[in-house]
Design a protein with these regions (language model features):
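Non-catalytic structural scaffold of enzyme domains
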Residues: 1-269
Length: 269
């Protein structure tokens, strides 16, 4: 079963963090329509158990595919770490492929690291799930991986805008073990973290390469659409819509900063 090419690309995250991924997709795939679900009523995902995360992945996947989609992007690292297979099981029944944030980042990091010392800055749930370590080990380079669990970083980023000294101090704290390990490449293992990339770069130094998922995910999505002849048949500008399980006003206010574009229709669900 092949989905209709006129359907949107669906994407979900625990809130607004995944909008950093959507931003890259809107730029790279301008003719495509997108349907984004922000599960902000259940934010943050990063401190939830694997079982709770799988429940959210199942609920979000069923909601989005029930509305119709030709591709599903899990734009949340914690959700992908614990629930990617659950999403794929549901998506398979709809003939829909699933793209996650973890494998593309691991592939890029392994390819660009000169020393093989790679850092992963992520939520507790993502680190505990071990998905990044497995993905990096699968690259077959004998990489030296340093994982840093940052339980409060995503909430601080989401709630602390505009950023003050406390945000910088928090970022600096989580950089200490990365500097001690002399990593030359850092995976930003949460879609909130690109917003503090300038702080990370300043603290770690210009020689450390920062890896984010947005561009790689957009490239993977384009490859899948082309291979399955699912690209949009129109050449004009696609539409993007939003679903939100939490407060719509807060989602709009925060989301505009993350997406760096206006948010149009937001449906509370």
């Amino acid at each position: 079963m092949t989905p209709d090419r006129s359907l949107p690309i669906a994407m979900f995250d625990s809130g607004v963090g995944g909008l950093t991924v959507l931003h890259e997709c809107l730029v790279s795939l301008p003719a495509e329509d997108f349907l984004y679900l922000g599960d902000s009523a259940h934010f943050p995902y990063g401190t939830k158990s694997a079982e709770d995360l799988r429940e959210r992945v199942v609920a979000n996947t069923e909601m989005l595919l029930g509305r119709g989609a030709k591709l599903l992007i899990v734009a949340c690292n914690s959700a992908a770490s614990a629930g990617a297979e659950a999403a794929r099981e549901i998506a398979d029944a709809h003939g829909v492929e699933v793209v996650t944030v973890i494998d593309p980042e691991a592939e890029i990091a392994a390819a660009i690291s000169g020393t093989g010392r790679i850092g992963v800055l992520a939520t507790p749930a993502t680190v505990a799930g071990g998905a990044y370590r497995r993905a990096l080990e699968a690259q077959g380079r004998g990489l030296d991986v340093t994982e840093v669990s940052a339980p409060d970083l995503a909430p601080i980023i989401q709630n602390g805008f505009p950023f003050d000294q406390s945000v910088l101090d928090t970022v600096r704290f989580y950089c200490e073990p990365l500097r001690a390990a002399s990593v030359d490449t850092l995976i930003l293992g949460c879609t909130h973290y690109p917003l503090v990339a300038p702080m990370l770069q300043r603290i770690l130094g210009r020689d450390v390469r920062l890896v984010t998922a947005g561009h790689a995910i957009a490239a993977n999505a384009q490859r899948i659409l082309e291979s399955r002849a699912l690209e949009s048949a129109t050449s004009g500008e696609g539409a993007y819509r939003f679903l939100c399980t939490g407060d719509v006003f807060s989602f709009r206010e925060l989301g505009t900063r993350f997406l760096q574009m206006p948010l149009g229709d937001i449906e509370g669900v």
